[in-house]
Amino acid sequence: MKRFFLSLLFFLVISDAYSNSEYQHGYAFLSQLKYPQGFEHFSYVNPDAPKGGTFRIPEMGAWDSFNPIPLRGRPLSGLDIWDPVDNFIYDSLLEGSLDEPSSYYAKLAKGVRVAPDGSYVDFKIRDDARWHDGRPISIEDVLFTFDVYMTKANPSIRTPLEIIERLEVLDQDEIRFWIAEESIGDPIVPIRIGVLSILPKHY
């Protein structure tokens, strides 16, 4: 009976997460999104907080690299590829909400769409997304990023991305991630893809 209940619960979680195949402003699989379309900031953020100053990060030991992608080297703090909260240089397609259990909102993306059966995840890039030098962030940057992660990165990045079968460009601002058969239906997949830092192809 317990096994049946857990199986039913997992099915309901997946069904809820994949129930809408239109573009959404966020993705959640344990509850409904708390924040509406077009919200300006998370409720725990003070938009009137002072800007500027110096930000210091404590670090144990030494570091010898600004690049967390290769296997060699020990990168400094603040460049976590998997955690947008701990990456102070590059943004991601989705951003997690700290006051919800499993909700992620479009950041570099302006929308996320998951297939009803979980076989693909689509992202639409924001028109106003820019790099630090002012150049627009494009689908080419997303393609470049995942090519690097899936073929040249260290195993801690490359192996989890075996969930992706291939990428397909749908339009100049839309990209589709086709999911490997064994990972179809896993509600974590859109999050795993969406939180990765996007890299500039031109840099």
Q: What is each stretch, according to the model?
A:
Residues 91, 140, 162-165:
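Extracytoplasmic/periplasmic beta-strand context in beta-sandwich domains
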Residues 20-117, 147:
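N-terminal lobe/hinge region of extracytoplasmic solute-binding protein
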Residues 4-13:
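Sec-dependent N-terminal signal peptides
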Residues 12-17, 149:
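Hydrophobic membrane-targeting alpha-helices
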Residues 98, 128, 180-182:
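Short loop segments at secondary-structure junctions
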Residues 45, 49-50, 70-81, 111-155, ...:
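Aromatic- and charge-enriched surface segment that lines or borders ligand/interaction sites
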Residues 124, 158-203:
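Surface-exposed binding/hinge segments that line
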